[in-house]
């Protein structure tokens, strides 16, 4: 039996001979860290849409993935309502955005998950979305409804075993996208976002390595900013953010507040460094047509056309 001291000594000997854990864990140990393994890829475009379950969008995708169990062409899954009555999955009658949607909050998402049972979607709608038809939590779309998404799923790699970084709403998961951490944020509460990750964001790394990037927005940022600031937490957020901005660069608050809710502002204290990288969607299309896109493009759609 190898003792703890012997194991540590063995690891040190391995590291001295170039076989340390980091070296062994690399997929191509013979290449230096950071070597370009796919040089033919010159541009990366990232589009992050709204929160949906796999089954909700692609559960009826035949031949790929682990979607809905089907009997005679109809999904068989059920969830109980508050009275214990089983509620079957329902084909959504329309792709039009509903005025009310099932909540994606931390609390609601954990009710839906139900300790791994994934049978709390009706209960979540009943408990967290007053006035919402509880059946909305059991709706799904088919290829006839979403031909573009199904076409993508059939043509390109599809992550059929992918799980969100945070079992919760938009802001924490978009923070994970750009920083690998939500910094403790679990809900869409703007006044809890006046912070910055200790290791920075992907934008900091792109700047450090001289890699070109741009964040394109689909909706004039001033309108998005007003929508964010006008909800229940908005005034508190505005006061905190305004004070922080005034302390950083007097007179710049108006400029930065006009560019809220692009991906780069999920950590607002870093937005100052990103202002020159923000651009309207029209410039994305123009750059794409000319073959002049930056190495990394983040695309934020028009959030008035919500896809929740």
Per-region residue spans from a language model:
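N-terminal pro-sequences and low-complexity stem/linker regions of secreted or lumenal proteins
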Residues: 1-308
């Amino acid at each position: 039996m190898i003792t703890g001291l012997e194991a540590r000594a063995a690891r040190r000997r391995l590291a001295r001979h170039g076989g340390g854990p980091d070296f062994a864990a690399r997929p191509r140990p013979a290449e230096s860290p950071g070597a370009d393994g796919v040089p033919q890829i010159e541009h990366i475009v990232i589009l992050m849409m709204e929160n949906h379950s796999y089954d909700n969008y692609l559960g009826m995708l035949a031949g790929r993935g682990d979607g809905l169990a089907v009997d005679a062409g109809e999904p068989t899954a059920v969830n109980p309502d508050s009275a214990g009555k089983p509620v079957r999955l329902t084909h959504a009658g329309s792709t039009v955005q509903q005025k009310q949607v099932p909540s994606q909050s931390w609390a609601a998402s954990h009710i839906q998950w139900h300790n791994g049972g994934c049978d709390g979607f009706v209960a979540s709608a009943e408990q967290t979305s007053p006035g919402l038809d509880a059946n909305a939590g059991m709706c799904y779309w088919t290829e006839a409804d979403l031909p573009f998404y199904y076409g993508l799923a059939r043509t390109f790699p599809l992550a059929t075993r992918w799980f969100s970084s945070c079992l919760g709403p938009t802001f924490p998961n978009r923070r994970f996208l750009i920083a690998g951490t939500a910094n403790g944020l679990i809900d869409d509460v703007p006044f809890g976002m006046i912070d910055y990750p200790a290791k920075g964001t992907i934008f900091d790394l792109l700047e450090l390595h001289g890699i070109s990037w741009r964040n394109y927005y689909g909706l004039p940022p001033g309108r998005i900013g007003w929508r964010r600031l006008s909800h229940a937490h908005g005034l508190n957020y505005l006061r905190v953010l305004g004070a922080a901005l005034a302390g950083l660069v007097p007179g710049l608050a108006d400029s930065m507040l006009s560019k809220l809710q692009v991906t780069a502002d999920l950590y607002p204290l870093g937005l100052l460094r990103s202002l020159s990288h923000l651009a309207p969607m029209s410039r994305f299309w123009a750059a794409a047509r000319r073959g002049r896109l930056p190495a990394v493009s983040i695309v934020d759609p028009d959030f008035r056309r919500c896809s929740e």
